[in-house]
Swiss-Prot record:
It is found in: Cytoplasm. Its EC number is 6.3.2.8. It holds the Pfam family Mur_ligase_C. The lineage of its organism: Bacteria, Pseudomonadati, Pseudomonadota, Alphaproteobacteria, Caulobacterales. It comes from Caulobacter vibrioides (strain NA1000 / CB15N) (Caulobacter crescentus). This is UDP-N-acetylmuramate--L-alanine ligase.
């Protein structure tokens, strides 16, 4: 039985989550269970997330049926849930409150001071890093993340402190419902245009995200990114803390070195008023220039919240990472296999740069499962030119994510695009069962294989080391 940790304003019946196993939904559901709500929910299939919630006391339904919402007091849903879902239809018929995921997250944020982490890329890792530094500083935050934090074994936790750290999802514009005390913007790229319509609308969304903070709060923004730097000129009456590698950044990272064990770097803080503060010789067991920038954002926020230099260094050195962010799934015959969620060209390029940095004497072999036909169509040029740090690129079929195929936008089109843009070795993957033998033919001891995508390619990455071992027996 879970102890009720905070009072709720009314006695409510069960709160029903449609798609409760989703990474964003499951985190909110877990927090609500832990603060005293009765939670139930449905999903198309059982998963590690639904099993974890069931152990915490949630009632879980597999499949969707109108009968599941009997007795519910409210329904929480995400934009992935269609209007004709039988549970949505039943909820409307019963005149139950239908609450968007972000709206429920905003309700949880009202209970504490909050840090909301936004940006096209890097949100999940940066959220985890902020949480790690606040934990190291004794602030014991509540956390709602978009990925499994290895240190917690879950994507959410209830802390005893005054702060909540959340990942702010811009994909459907719902992050504008989050009224945070502190905001972070890591970068801004042309993504999720199916919702926003055009890039100007995306940029305006991030401007509003920052303007939503109160006068006593602040936003940490990465001015290494040109669109974020441009954004700073449009923000009025809100405090900004800039960070990056450039000399104009208030929180500047320098002397970055990559090695097999991760990154080392220095940070110097040069506030507009007051003396400069140095953090020299910081170590982080995570590769990639992009992750150093994510860590710099976390340092910028942590020091503003009162975390001292010793705790910051300890928190970074002990950072356990996030599942599906450059996660090593095994080593077979000297070949390292890595799983990564990267599915946008900017993310893929950053991951491959990190892979190259930690594999100085071996080959980098990328296996990519494009995610959504519309994304591949809209960014075909970018996808065709973002794999330069991979010696070999193996392209799988597109993961549909519920979309219908688009003529001329498929695996073979991307292979052709890679070759057109000058890649020397781009290969199609006929089916997942062919992957082990293809990797065995391409890779030797000392090489790194990274599997990229937001679909079910993650299951291939965990199976691959054992499959490679079996081929040599």
């Amino acid at each position: 039985m879970i102890q009720r940790r905070r009072p709720v304003p009314f006695e409510l019946g069960p709160v029903h989550f449609i798609g409760i196993g989703g990474i964003g939904m499951s985190g909110i559901a877990e927090i609500m269970i832990r603060i005293g709500y009765t939670v139930q929910g449905s999903d198309a299939k059982a998963s590690a997330n639904t099993e974890r919630l069931e152990k915490l006391g949630a009632r879980i339904f597999i499949g969707h049926d109108a009968a599941h919402v009997e007795g519910a007091s409210a329904i929480v849903y995400s934009t992935a849930v269609k209007a004709d879902n039988p549970e949505m239809v039943a909820g409307r018929d019963k005149r139950l409150p239908l609450v968007r995921r972000a709206e429920m997250l905003a309700e949880l944020m009202r209970l504490q001071f909050s840090v909301a982490v936004g940006g096209t890329h890097g949100k999940t890792t940066t959220t985890s890093m902020v949480a790690a530094l606040l934990d190291a500083g004794g602030l014991d935050p509540t956390v709602v993340n978009g990925g499994i934090i290895n240190a917690y074994g879950t994507n959410a936790k209830v802390g005893e402190g005054d702060w909540i750290v959340v990942e702010a999802d811009e994909s459907d514009g719902s992050f504008l419902k989050l009224k945070s005390t502190v905001a972070i913007v890591t970068n801004i790229d042309a993504e999720h245009l199916d919702h926003w319509g055009d890039f100007d609308a995306v940029k305006k969304g991030f401007q509003d995200f920052i303007q939503n903070i109160p006068f006593y709060g602040f936003a940490a923004v990465c001015t290494d990114h040109p669109e974020v730097q441009a954004l700073t000129s449009r923000i009025e009456n809100r405090r900004l803390v800039t960070y990056g590698t450039n000399p104009q950044a208030e929180v500047r990272v320098s002397n970055i070195e990559m090695g097999p064990e991760g990154a080392t770097f220095d940070i110097i803080v040069s506030p507009r008023a007051g003396e400069a503060v140095r953090y020299d010789g910081l170590k982080m067991p995570m590769a990639g220039h992009h992750n150093v920038l994510n860590a710099t954002a976390a340092v910028a926020v942590a020091r503003e919240l009162g975390v001292d230099a010793e705790a910051i260094a300890k928190g970074l050195a002990g950072f356990g990472g996030v599942k599906r962010r450059f996660t090593t799934t095994g080593v077979a015959n000297g070949i390292r296999v890595v799983d990564d969620y990267g599915h946008h060209p900017v993310e893929i390029a950053a991951v491959l740069k990190a892979a190259r940095a930690v594999t100085p004497n071996g080959k980098v072999i990328a296996v990519v499962q494009p995610h959504r036909f519309t994304r591949l169509r809209d960014l075909m040029t970018e996808f065709s030119s973002c794999f330069n740090d991979a010696d070999t690129v193996i392209v799988a079929d597109v993961y549909t994510a519920g979309e219908q195929p688009i003529p001329g936008v498929d695996r073979d089109a991307l292979v052709a695009g890679l070759k057109k843009f000058g890649h020397r070795r781009a290969l199609p993957l006929e089916n997942p069962t062919a992957l082990p033998r293809l990797i065995a033919a391409e890779a030797t001891s000392g090489d790194l294989v990274v599997l990229l995508g937001a679909g079910d390619i993650t299951t291939w990455s965990y199976a691959l080391p054992g499959q490679l071992e079996a081929l040599t027996k």
